[in-house]
Regions:
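Short, acidic, Ser/Thr-enriched surface-loop or helix-capping motifs
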Residues: 103, 159, 229
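General beta-strand structural signal in soluble alpha/beta enzymes
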Residues: 62-64, 190-194, 228
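Short glycine-aspartate micro-motif
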Residues: 77, 87-91, 146-150, 215-219, ...
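Glycine-rich phosphate-binding loop of actin/hexokinase-like ATP-binding domains
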Residues: 212-269
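Short helix-capping/turn signature of helix-turn-helix
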Residues: 27-28, 170, 206, 221
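Hydrophobic "anchor" residues
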Residues: 108, 164, 234-235
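Glycine-rich phosphate-binding loop and adjoining helix at the ATP-binding site
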Residues: 111-214, 350-360
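ATP-binding/phosphotransfer module of carbohydrate and carboxylate kinases, centering on a glycine-rich
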Residues: 1-145, 265-406
Length: 406
């Protein structure tokens, strides 16, 4: 996240405390100052100072709480104030860019999906900035105070410095300084994250893994990867938070991957590779119901659910390959649950048992026997994943402090 700074010790304490108080108000509001002091384990004087600054900045508001059966003056509670604060959430995928204006509660104000061609003479960075400018121009009457920009996209990304080293599909991308360029252009902090990691954060904050402390989330789409929540926090390794299972070699003699290696899991389990294998198998078998119709993920899943042997075998094979890599991760992280986000989840009754069986066969029984395989709540489209980046920046205080000081 390029927008994060390295504050001094005292400033870091202030940032952390403010973020903790904001999180409690956001999650529990309306909540009293007394309860905030107890829950945040901060002195009442500290709570008073932090809350006063948030009230003056119109980030929180006071609300009378009338408790049932109580007499006398109502208690005063605090709630976040979100409608006057907006951020831009951007999602870049293969051939498309999603742009959405959301308020700080993550409520959608307006969203667009536009074409972003894979091969064009104009560099991708320049095209992204142009789309942002035009989006703001089109929707300037709806825009309240802009706080930040959140960007999620596939590729090999240095999230700390906002640099995209490589991207699938967009071959001209090499060391693209996306975060820095957009921050200089707009004047607001920019948070950039791999789409799978951001999606993992969104599920933890708003979705299927909310409340779980240890989770592995696997995405099987045009790209394959995983995010890990351990002890309630997204796992970070250096400047990356993505577990690159998609670039784990499963076949040294396999197809060349965009990362430069051969036989990566992504070249076998991504939906493009799955459809390619299905077409190859169809050319050798005339008995499948997939003949005589367009071959898509939907038609493949539908055929599998209707008992087509070829379709079932293809999807089971994906589950076995993914499960083999997940077994290693289960041994490392001992998760409570594994979330699967994939268009192939339309055949979850086939895919998920194949993944679970592979894990049970190859992981430690003590770890694998209680692990649950479930579907994600959200999909890999749209801009909800970016909402998690902004929410996290408010909770850790990095964005909150900037808003208080502006």
């Amino acid at each position: 996240m390029v927008a994060d700074s390295q504050p001094g010790h005292i400033d870091q304490i202030k940032q952390t405390n403010a973020g903790a108080v904001y999180r409690l108000i956001d999650q529990l509001g309306p909540v009293s100052r007394i309860d905030l002091s107890r829950l945040a384990q901060l002195a009442p004087a500290s709570i008073t100072k932090i809350v006063r600054e948030m009230l003056e900045a119109h980030l929180v508001q006071e609300l009378e709480i009338k408790e049932a059966g109580s007499r006398g003056r109502p208690a005063v509670g605090l709630m976040v104030e979100t409608e006057a604060w907006h951020y831009l959430s951007i999602r870049i995928s293969r051939g498309e860019i999603f742009l959405a204006l959301r308020d700080l509660s993550s409520k959608l104000v307006v969203e667009e999906c536009l074409a972003l061609p894979l091969n064009e003479a104009t560099p991708l960075l320049e095209r992204i900035i142009t789309h942002v400018d035009r989006f703001f121009t089109r929707h300037q009457q709806k825009l309240e105070r802009l706080t930040s920009i959140a960007i999620t996209l596939p590729g090999i990304i240095d999230t700390e410095n906002g640099v995209v080293h490589r991207m699938p599909y967009y071959e001209d991308v090499k060391e693209m300084p996306l975060g820095d360029a957009l921050e200089r252009h707009t004047g607001v902090p920019v948070y950039i994250q791999h789409d799978i990691s951001a999606w993992t954060m969104a599920e933890a904050l708003f979705g299927a893994s909310r409340g779980a402390r240890d989770v592995i989330q696997v995405v099987i789409d045009h790209n394959v990867g995983a995010g890990v929540i351990t002890d309630g926090h997204l796992l970070h390794a250096g400047s990356s938070s993505l577990v690159e299972i998609g670039h784990t070699q499963v076949d040294p003699y396999g197809k060349r991957c965009y990362c430069g290696n051969h036989g990566c899991l992504e070249t076998i389990a991504s939906v493009d590779s799955v459809l390619e294998l299905t077409q190859l198998r169809l050319n050798q078998s005339m008995s499948s119901m997939l003949h005589g119709q367009p071959l898509t993920v939907d038609s493949l899943c539908q055929a599998a659910m209707q008992g087509d042997l070829l379709a079932k075998d293809i999807i089971s094979g994906v589950g076995a390959h993914v499960g083999r890599i997940l077994a290693i991760m289960v041994n490392l992280f001992n998760p409570q649950k594994i979330l699967i986000g994939s268009p192939l989840s339309k055949a979850a009754d086939i895919l998920f048992p194949a993944i679970a069986d592979s894990i049970r066969q190859q992981a430690l029984p003590a770890y694998s026997r209680n692990t649950v395989v479930e579907s994600t709540q959200f999909t890999n489209q749209g801009t909800m994943a970016g909402a998690a980046l902004v929410k996290d920046a408010m909770y850790n205080g990095s964005l909150l402090i900037r808003l208080l000081q502006s």
